[in-house]
Every structure is written in C-alpha cells, then in structure tokens.
Amino acid sequence: MKKNPIFVHKFALMRQMIALFAATLLLGGCWSARERQIIADGDGLMRVLQVTEPYDSVVLRAVSIEFQASMLNSATYRRLCERMLLTVQDPEHEGVGIAAPQVGINRRLVAVQRFDKEGEPFEFYPNLRILTARGDSVAGPEGCLSVPGLRGIVRRSRDIDVRYLNPATLRDTTERVTGFTAVIFQHEADHLAGTFYTDKADSLFTE
C-alpha cells in the first residue's frame, strides 16, 4: 500500500503530543505550567474535550496521575473544582459526573453527583480508586460529555468500595457506595484510566 504523506505527518505529530504528555506526567508532585494555564484561563465553563478530536483523544486516553496532598490546599485546586462544577452543571450539556481529564487535566480527580445523599450534591474525589465491586453487574444506559451523539448499555456493579484522598483531612478515606451513584463513580474512574464506557458497552446507539 502506498504511503500517504499526510498520514505520516499526522502520525508523527501524534507521537510528539504523546511524548509531551508523558513529560508532563513525570512532574507529578506539583502543578505543571500547562495545567496552571488551562485552569487559570477564565472563570467560567471549561472546554470539554471530545474523543472525536485527535488532540483531545490523546489527553482523554492518557492514564491520570495522583495529587500530592499539599496540592489540595492550593488556590489552583480550588479553582479547578469550581470550574469543573460549573462545567458539569451547564444547562446546555448537563451531566451527573465529570473527570479532570475531560477538561484537559490528567489528574485523578472526579466530581460525582451524590444521588444517595440529601440534596443530591456534587462532591469531589481526588486520587479516586475503586477498591471492590460486589454482586452481579447490572446493565444500564450511559452517555458521556466527551462522546457526542452516542449512548450505550454497560454492565456495572451497584455496590462498590471507593478510596480517595479526603480534601478536609488530607487522609485516605474508604467509603461504600451503592445504587446509581456507584455507577457514576465507576464511569468517572474509567476516565482516569483512559477508558470510555464505549470500550465496555454491550451495545451502542445514537441519541
């Protein structure tokens, strides 16, 4: 098959972007200049990355890294949470959860709407990990702010244990979560591993 020069150029560009993100992730213990720029660029909604865009896809498919505890006391962290909350609550593209990679930040941070709590508040979970999944998986519909125009049927546990770095105490905290809220946690945790619900779906359909 004849080599396409346009394809070769795009492939080389993609490799450069992957190398750039790998270098950024090695910093780990502090905010990178790129992260600070994205978070400080405005006070309102953040752009939600789309898997259909090649550059966005590189970010979305990367494995996110953990925060150092000291980072949670920074103005940069607080601003990121504020802007992520505004973004997931945007009336035009409202969601029930969002992960930091979806707004261009490859850190282990998710916001989840707690339908299992009074008032159904959004709460943030840095360094989130799913520890245990109990019982049979149940099939249910899912969509994603980063996957436009599609929905799918995905099997998830309705009873899980999660661990996260508590922003108030700066200590690891373990919590049991059940029901639909457990599904949201699993969906958002997948983003931190560079995975989409479409990778696990039994079937996909257009909205």
Residue ranges and their predicted role:
Residues 19-28:
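Bacterial N-terminal signal peptides
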Residues 2-3, 14-16:
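Positively charged n-region of N-terminal signal peptides that target proteins for export
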Residues 28-207:
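Positively charged
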